[in-house]
A protein has these predicted regions:
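A solvent-exposed interaction/effector surface
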Residues: 1-156
Length: 156
């Protein structure tokens, strides 16, 4: 797995906050993409999720996460009860690509965590998964491509 440091520029996103089961993400994605289509909002990137606790260890209905998608920064769409418009501010991340099923994505997280320690990075925020090729676009789970981003600062 190739891991590299990247600087993420400010990014305007449409985002939904959620606490519940990870399997509910499909419903959230449907609501978000439906809203984008109805409101004719120009997107500027791929669907993503930010996890505030570990979905693999949290109780089933207590996973805390956001689902979002970058939008054209010049747009100023109206928010809904569930969908907010926010700007993610510029920050540094360690980025790695996970290929294949999300069932074994924890292995990629472990590799990235080891890399961060070995290279003196401090992970300072919640991980973000960007679904470059998501399950709505591919027929086989092995064709999934997910970018993992860990917000970091370089130590020493």
């Amino acid at each position: 797995m190739e891991i590299k440091e990247k600087t993420m520029e400010d990014q305007k996103v449409a985002i939904m906050n959620y606490k519940g089961a990870l399997k509910d993400m499909d419903v959230l994605v449907s609501k978000l993409t439906g809203w984008i289509e109805v409101e004719e909002i120009e997107t500027a990137g791929d669907l993503f999720a930010i996890f505030y606790n570990n979905p693999r260890t949290a109780k089933e209905n207590e996973v805390v996460y956001d689902v979002g998608i970058p939008i054209n920064p010049e747009l100023d769409p109206d928010e809904t009860e569930e969908i907010r418009i926010v700007t993610l501010i510029e920050h540094k991340v360690l980025s790695g690509i996970h290929n294949g099923s999300l069932d074994n994505i924890q292995e990629s997280y472990n590799i990235m965590a080891e890399y961060s320690i070995e290279n003196k990075y401090d992970i300072i925020g919640s991980p973000k998964e960007i679904y470059l090729k998501n399950k709505y676009e591919v027929d086989n789970e092995e064709d999934l491509v997910t970018e993992i981003q860990l917000p970091v600062i370089k130590m020493g």
